[in-house]
Amino acid sequence: MGTKWTEEQKQAITTRGSNLLVAAAAGSGKTAVLVERIINLITDEENPVDIDRLLVVTFTNAAASEMRERIAEALIAILDQNPEDKRLANQLTLLNKATITTIHSFCLEVVRNNFFLLDLDPNFRIGDDTETLLLQLEASEELFEEMYAKEDKDKEGFLTLVESYGGTKDDQDLQDILLRLYGFVRSLPWPEKWLKDVINTFRVEDNFKFETSKWAEVILDSLKVEISGILNTMLVAVDKLKNEAGLEGYFHAFQREAYEIEQLLQYDNWNEFKNHIQAIEFERLPNAGKDANKNVKEEVSNIRKKVKDKIKEIKEKFFSDSVEEIKDEIKALYPIMEALADLILLFDKKYKEKKREKGIIDFNDIEHFALQILTEIDEEGAVNPSEVALHYREKFEEIFVDEYQDSNLIQEEILSIIARENPPNRFMVGDVKQSIYRFRQANPYIFFEKYNSYSLDTGEKNQKILLYKNFRSRIEVIEAINYIFKKIMSKNIGEVNYTEEEKLNYGAEYEIPPEDSVTGGAVELHLIEKQKVEEEVEEKEEEKNEEKDFEEEEEDLIDDIQVEARVVAERIKQLFSQNFMVYDKNIKSYRVVDYRDIVVLLRATDRWAPVFLEELTQAGIPAFADTGTGYFDTTEIKTIISLLQVIDNPMQDIPLLAVLRSPIFSFTEEELIDLRLEDMEKTIYEAIKKASQREDELGEKAKNFLDTLKKWQEKAVYMPVDEFLWYLYKDTGYYSYVAAMPQGVQRQANLRILFERAKQYEETSFKGLFNFINFINRLKVSSGDMGSAKIVGENENVVRIMSIHKSKGLEFPVVIVAGLGKQFNTKDLYQKILYHHFLGLGPEFVDFRRRISYPSIVKEAIKYKIKLEGLSEEMRVLYVALTRAKEKLILVGSARDIKKNVRKWANAAILQEKVSEYDILNGKSYMDWIGAAVIRHKDLEPLREFAGVSLSEEEDASKWEVKLWNKKDVLLEKEKNDKVDVVERLRSLDLDAHYSEFYKEVERRLNYVYPYEKACYLPAKLSVTEVKRILNAEVVDEDTTSIFEREVLKTPIFLEKKKGLTAAEKGIAMHLVMQKLDLDKDLSLEGIKEQIKDMVDREILTEEQAKEVNIHKIEGFFKTSLGERMLSSKNVKREVPFHIKLSSREIYKDLPEEYENEFIQVQGIIDCFFEEEDGLVLIDYKTDYVQEGKVEEIKERYKVQIELYSKALENITGKKVKEKYIYLFFNGNILEY
């Protein structure tokens, strides 16, 4: 029985004589339609087409192979019915040489068949990414050296580029800009023409009108989105004022101001918009009545103030300069942009020479060479098909393009030039909602242009057909996807209006499941609350952890990922425990879910996938993660790279500590602390040299390290890097060592890959260890991660963990999309020079002589456009993720404060059917979008109730189930599960009597209680604050609060990004200033103010931090007798870290005597101490507010902490601490101990 095609599918299969654009939604059977159309052409009784007369272009090699297989299967099926049909049998033979391929492979065929037209060596090969990156680095180094050596006007322009964009220390930033821009330009069909046209946009003539430029148009669009957000916020305030007694005057004033703001949305002209916004004034509000609600008055007044500030900011940022001044700014950018374009062209020439010498081409060359072969440029600059292109036009009866939404401009140019014009013969199929390869320069506007211009009418030369019936997913999945995207996807963000025409229509046929079975069900939303903000503030304030290092931040992130992974693992186990069933088309029946039916999708897999893999595996769930990343994060590679860095320069503390701690030298943690205490002012390397003079075991280890390092440094001078690297593997024994580690085979393979990279490096003109380390660092950034070896096959019965991008084109019965709270990556917006295929170059305006820089108005326009396109892509990525699900969709995400987030989502959904573009633009994660879209749904009432949000309920066919998780509870639950009684498990087994004695022995051993069990639970390390908490457990912390009161009034959503500093951050700023002040300079109010300004200039403080520092209180300290004594001392130390060893019984008083020799490392930071003739004076600063009459209680509370500081200080210095003080900034009190 043949396939039942819908009318739209039949139309796509049978229509002839037109260019056809098939807009095919997820799960609409587009591949089946494409294959059927090919079969239909081959078997057409009147005008049959041989398979080798068709060009079928797919996005990946895998897709090409699948297409070829499907065509073969279809042909064989027809041959079974018509075994005598020789022509059909011949098609199977022709299929092997049919052009069913990727665009790159097709272009490569064009180049190989016509190499003589390019003066190209026929034996050329394609260089891999590493090889071509090395050549690019080599070419850029040589080019820069040549430019520095020049003595003409080109050098002047180049030096201006270096001064403006080169960076503070060297020209590395400019090299990065050059390589990044070159990569972008090479993705365009005509790079040189694009550069020339772009540079000419800066060559403004006297008649240039900025107000009608494309840049002004984009900025106006962005401002209208901003204004709409401001307007919505004002309307919320207006709504709150309705029927408020005593605030009638406020109500009318707010209405009037909201109306003035609303009028801005009607202007499409720069000058009209400018005139209106400059005319907006916020007059003094009338007095409120005596019966006015003070809370409402305060809330709306605060909203109005924020709106005023925002309008003022827009005026100053965009409309403080006249259009003439803007024109002068653009004109001033012309010479430097021209110099940049010239540099790109010179680099292109040099890079081509390098490739020619090596006999290689890169992937971009393939497409450009093909375009060069297929086109001829006439005298007027028009592009015409060459003879080769005309040959292909004659050869191919029809050109098929799959995944058309992912085409880029050069690919479109190539396919257009070989396509026929009369009759048209292009068949393009794709879904613009699934265009997710912008980072590869895929351009969805190519699809849009045709989608908007092609007709739905049959018989037209250019026709479009819409396939929006989804044959993949259950109705619950489809309804939920439609509900989300009708709320958030628009023409501006997502670049598609998610209308009735675009939405998914249910087309799958799922049989009725067995009675009492668990199938399908509501879409699940799992929200995990991470550690609350208040807890974080308390910890930061008390522990003064203002210099939280990178490793700690990494640990926090890993913790958050672990929690999500554990929630996912728990849900997967529940699916199996409840015998969740899926429909299997192969057996035409329901069956219990398998692991292979489940996929976990992540936006980024580099840090996330390894954690998910480990957690699922520990939970007994077989899993597979083909991340393609993680190479540089593996222990063995990090260790060896650290070792190379140390051999090159041992003065680097972090790599040196990594090497010392590694199995290569095996220093213990205690020994490293001992080393640090040798001399707190010197580097670790200098401390090792000092320690090598000792006669103890540490001295021996230090001497061995220095001798070994010297030996390696001598060999590194004359040995090639690859040989030296292999020598290190063998001399350290590390290559053999990793083989004995878990996944040892893979680890050795990773080390061999590094060796291969070293061999490639040695083939260039670069030499030496220093340059190799730089190359590896550039490889991390420029080429991404290299990926580590695979061990488990993805075809096994495992849960797959993969990126959303890799899942495209696939489908799974159960889809779990995790990491939805992860913030969007916006780093592209902060480059010094932005670029856009339509808007050109957007540079920072730099006056290096005056040392000032700011974003040019051109950059502001491009920045907004890139942000818009980036978020549109993120929305399409989310769409791809959700549409992978066939039967069950589970969404998982974390948030710092769920109640706060729910209130934010409610504000975004409160005034309109669709979430506003402003709120979408200001969403920080997928969770923000999903939350705002679904928060009004009737099924989310429990979540609204939890957050105390009152919102009108919305009816919708979609079904939702919300589950809240707490990070702490998830971690505790995991620990509890890990401690399940093994003996109880043994008891549940049906053991033969034969094994009873053996069983008893097992039980005895498993029930053995270690006599020093408490020692197993003692921490190895505690902070001073933690010790204080343990020893002061009976003290109730209610007498101190922060000086810096946190704002409790609700802030409008559009201003949430400007929250101001938290209480902890303000205290941190005070400590930082006290640490960095130059005590030899003027410490008057003006002097302190000047030093703080200098700290901002040197980026020690941010401007926001500087504003929060109370210079009067700092001056007040230095006017005290204690402050004056400190200034008189010749030896003042500030922010001194320390470690001391305490007996566990000093901290845990209830431990018995046998624990006397169990030690705990205590660590902390001493704010300040200074030396006088008869000893040391210790000072600890506090920024707490102390309630009246509670000073003595505060003094008592911090007694333990001060004693520990004193003890540590005496251990470190060997000198007596004669006096100990706490200084309270709030009231200037000095507490002496």
Swiss-Prot record:
| Keyword field | ATP-binding, DNA damage, DNA repair, DNA-binding, Exonuclease, Helicase, Hydrolase, Isomerase, Nuclease, Nucleotide-binding
Q: Which domain of life is it from?
A: Bacteria
Which cellular component, as a GO term, is one annotated location?
Answer: cytosol
The protein's name is ATP-dependent helicase/nuclease subunit A
Q: Which residues form the UvrD-like helicase ATP-binding domain?
A: 3-474
What's the name of its gene? addA
**Positions that bind ATP:** 24-31
NCBIfam families named among the record's database cross-references: addA_Gpos
According to UniProt, the reaction catalysed is: Couples ATP hydrolysis with the unwinding of duplex DNA by translocating in the 3'-5' direction; ATP + H2O = ADP + phosphate + H(+)
Provide the family line. Answer: Belongs to the helicase family. AddA subfamily.
- Residues of the region (Disordered) are 533-555
User: What is any one GO biological process for this UniProt entry?
Assistant: double-strand break repair via homologous recombination
Which InterPro entries does the entry link to? AddA, DNA_helicase_UvrD-like_C, DNA_helicase_UvrD/REP, P-loop_NTPase, PDDEXK-like_dom_sf, PDDEXK_AddAB-type, Restrct_endonuc-II-like, UvrD-like_ATP-bd
Q: Where is the UvrD-like helicase C-terminal domain?
A: 518-809
